[in-house]
Amino acid sequence: MLARFPLYLRLIRMDKPIGSLLLLWPTLNALWIASDGHPAPSLVVIFALGTLLMRSAGCAINDYADRDFDRHVKRTAERPLTSGKIRAWEAIAIAVGLALVSFLLILPLNGLTKELSVVAVFVAATYPFMKRFFAIPQAYLGIAFGFGIPMAFAAVQDTVPMIAWAMLAANVFWSVAYDTAYAMVDRDDDLKIGMRTSAITFGRHDVLAIMLCYAAMLGIYVWLGAALHFGWPYWAGWAAAAGCSIYHYTLIKDRERMACFAAFRHNNWLGGVLFAGIAAHYALAVR
């Protein structure tokens, strides 16, 4: 078992934290806004660990669902499950175990948060299979990656206000943007094996679609900042995030594979500076 441990870590992408960070930033945004900048440390720990665990569980489920497709894609052919180094039942067992630990984390929280967690698990577990049916499965991914937002509001306020759903919508647009750039890396392979992705659906309009999704996401955050009367630190963070999106355009405009992958990874900075703006607004407002 110990000899297989490194394979399990690769299965759940512990060597690639970018996915966890893309889940974490929107969740932290929600925690800070829901608590007026003063989230309980215990909640921050619970949601940070929950984000890591559920993203890891999602990776295991994704590799299980895609195991027959991944062997035909150069980038994924050597994943532990695809290459036969671990078995399918091991991936399922790991996913279930991680999901159970995640549920244990939220046991101290209120009933609404627990109810929403059931929806979150369902969406996360079914996302990998949506790539067979949906033309833009990245939108479904945005719901899965962003469900920590309504859960955070529920944990703090015991309700989910409209602003939480607006933030979830923003996350859907953001996910479509960054994951389309990611899908552009594998587009040729995905076309051969019949996988459905937004990069294939958007076709020659892929770059335009990505930039429109960034614009929609940033537009929602303009409304959010105005509605909550945020000060200049927030708008500085927003401007930095907008600058990141423009930089991403320079990377994806020629559709070069590695540049598209770099744009995907750089979204960590976009999410980070936006959260920094929110946190700085509340921190400076106290003084």
Curated annotation (Swiss-Prot):
Known pathway: Cofactor biosynthesis; ubiquinone biosynthesis
Subcellular location: Cell inner membrane
Pfam families: UbiA (PF01040)
Cofactor(s) recorded in Swiss-Prot or TrEMBL: Mg(2+)
UniProt topology in membrane: Multi-pass membrane protein
Disulphide linkage map: none
Gene3D superfamilies in the cross-refs: UbiA prenyltransferase
A GO molecular function held by the record: 4-hydroxybenzoate polyprenyltransferase activity
EC number, UniProt record: 2.5.1.39
Sorted UniProt keywords: Cell inner membrane, Cell membrane, Magnesium, Membrane, Transferase, Transmembrane, Transmembrane helix, Ubiquinone biosynthesis
Catalysis: reaction(s): all-trans-octaprenyl diphosphate + 4-hydroxybenzoate = 4-hydroxy-3-(all-trans-octaprenyl)benzoate + diphosphate
Primary residence: membrane
Residue ranges of the TM segments: 30-50, 92-112, 133-153, 158-178, 207-227, 232-252, 266-286
HAMAP family: UbiA (MF_01635)
NCBIfam families recorded: ubiA_proteo
Protein function: Catalyzes the prenylation of para-hydroxybenzoate (PHB) with an all-trans polyprenyl group. Mediates the second step in the final reaction sequence of ubiquinone-8 (UQ-8) biosynthesis, which is the condensation of the polyisoprenoid side chain with PHB, generating the first membrane-bound Q intermediate 3-octaprenyl-4-hydroxybenzoate.
Identification of the protein by name: 4-hydroxybenzoate octaprenyltransferase
